[in-house]
Amino acid sequence: MATLILPTARAQNNASIHTSWLWHLHQPIYWPEERAGSDHYENAWDTIQAQGAGRSHPVEQVRGQVFDIDDRRAAYQCRPHDALASIGQYVKSGAQLNYSGALMENVQSLGAAGQLGYASNWYQSNKDAKGWTTSGGKSRVDLTNFSYHHALAPFLSDETLEMELRIHKRQMQLLWGDPTSHGYFPAEACFSERMIPILNKINIAWTVIANNHLARACSDFPLVIGSGGENCDLPNRADQINPAQGAGNYQRLTIDRGCSPTSAMPFSFQTHYARHVDPNTGTESKIIVVPSDQALGWKDSYSTWDLGLLNGLNARNNPNKPSLVLLAHDGDNAWSGGYSYYMEWVPNFASQ
């Protein structure tokens, strides 16, 4: 994982907090019917042609409402590359890019047909950026693993999850080459420790999780429900086995969805190990969990935001286990899919 050491953190002796982004890109297979004359489902160009010939489904006009939008054309081909090029003077800077398998197929179909402004080598900019390295020798664009069709992993059988991950990894190899990432972004941040043995099996070493799951499992989590608090399942007291953090070490930030996610500082901004123990054999599997902040990720998706919101975390930062603010969100929707985000806010953020 490539990170940016945030200069706004004013602690001395290189005790700054770290920041990074994960930009998630996805479009589904809009009409998964078998393509005429083949054993494969339709991709974007197939569906566009069928709609152009008068077919009424799917409801979405895949040409005009989905792929034929300038910001998406750029996001799916070159804009993450361009954004990171704009901050190349920061030698530790980088981001994670999460590109679904379904989107790869859709864009590949448009590029192969020379349609809607997609090039046959649409993948090249990401491949080039993957070859850039930080001062620590890490790829500046870490193209992370994902369930190929945006499947919600905890609801899959072990066999299905393994196959979704393997075909996604293989598609990344074909487009962007080896080595593939050791990281994983779960669709909709849906994670369960039951998945850990499968992730281990295919050489995934770390996974993103929503950091409110770390906070809500602390024994002194200050639960507030409703519009001023959580909008998720209430914590099970039997799961609250993370250490107490102290009343002054929780931060509750309001976002526009009518809730206020709560984070523990610095606990839910630090990496941890999660484990799964097979109840039949006692075999233990472990994985590193990398927390993404729910409130700050939301804010980064929709507008510029005041980096002073990180002051409380910075004051509690442990230089022996530095805090990481991971801003994980869509890179092709809302404000964070546009030029102003990638080419203005990203360099502005990095310079502060």
Region locations from a protein language model:
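Short catalytic/ligand-binding loop motif for oxyanion handling, primarily in non-cytosolic enzymes
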Residues: P28-P32, L103-S109, A151-F155, F191-M195, ...
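Aromatic- and acidic-residue-enriched carbohydrate-binding clefts of CAZyme catalytic domains
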Residues: E34-D70, T134-H150, I225-A244, I288
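Sec-dependent, cleavable N-terminal signal peptides
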Residues: M1-Q12
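N-terminal regions that are enriched for targeting/export leaders
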Residues: Q12-W132
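Acidic, His- and aromatic-enriched active-site or binding-groove loops in soluble protein domains
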Residues: Q115-D142, R166, D178, N200-A274
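Short, surface-exposed basic-aromatic patches at helix termini and helix-loop junctions that form
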Residues: E193-V208, Y342-Q352
